[in-house]
A protein has these predicted regions:
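Short, Lys/Arg-enriched N-terminal segments with co-localized hydrophobic residues
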Residues: 1-6
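Short phosphate-binding loop-to-helix
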Residues: 57, 64-108, 112-125
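Conserved core of the sugar-phosphate nucleotidyltransferase
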Residues: 115-202
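Low-acidity, Ser/Thr- and Arg-rich intrinsically disordered low-complexity segments
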Residues: 205, 212-214, 219, 228-231
């Protein structure tokens, strides 16, 4: 992975780590022990190394996670239990923290204990353009990995704009050849003010509208993907 230099920006950026206890596949995952510390501690420690983040907090709906965060001296915000997604939980936490409308919120996945802080800095860089409201990431993947429905792929236009995301194999090549396929990386950043247009909590139709925007793609090892929500 490529590592860029430290990014200097006056944009206020906050990292929020959603941590839900009641996962159907792995209940209590944020508390999973990794080398004597809970998983969320490792996520937080790696995120702290990203120089662009002014503050980082955990957002949870469970007292067990909140108590563990207190024990490890990690800031924590309690949220509702009925959120449909981690993104909704992140925005509730940001609202409770009184984050500025022009500030950038990075939704840091709570199950990425080895997260490279350079990836966060790449994700935030597009917001130096004041029109950018949403950013995410993609990276080239092998045809074998692309064949898995567990890997979300990114469809791009001829000019490199990301058009939509799909679990199906894309792009479809009628000649049977394989072009570069981009796999989506589930890390997002938003301007806080985006909630004023799309409302809170985000509903399924809103997420579809997010994904249907034409999103300029910047070519790096990890591709920051940015969207002008007015487009």
């Amino acid at each position: 992975m490529a590592h860029g230099g430290e990014m200097n920006t006056s944009i206020p950026c906050y990292g929020i780590i959603p941590a839900r206890y009641d996962s159907s596949r792995f209940p209590g995952k944020p508390l999973a022990d990794i080398w004597g510390r809970p998983m969320f501690w490792h996520v937080y420690a790696h995120a702290k190394r990203a120089s662009v983040l002014r503050n980082i907090v955990l957002a949870t709906d469970d007292e067990r996670i909140a108590e563990a965060a207190l024990e490890w001296e990690i800031p924590c915000v309690m949220t509702r239990r009925d959120h449909a997604s981690g993104t909704d939980r992140v925005f509730e936490a940001a609202s409770k923290l009184g984050v500025e409308p022009h500030a950038v919120i990075v939704n840091i996945q709570g199950d990425e204990p080895a997260l490279d802080p350079a990836v966060i800095e790449q994700l935030v860089r597009p917001f130096l353009d004041g029109t950018v409201q949403v950013s995410t990431l993609a990276t080239p993947i092998s045809p074998e990995r692309a064949a898995s429905p567990n890997q979300v792929k990114v469809v791009t236009a001829a000019n490199g704009d990301a058009l939509y995301f799909s679990r199906s194999r894309i792009p479809f090549d009628r000649e049977g050849g394989d072009g570069e396929i981009l796999g989506h990386i589930g890390l997002y950043a938003f301007r806080m003010g985006v909630t004023r247009r799309y409302g809170f909590p985000f509903h399924f139709s809103t997420r579809i509208e997010f994904n249907s925007n034409s999103i300029p793609l910047i070519s790096t090892v990890f591709h920051p993907v940015k969207a002008n929500m007015e487009s």
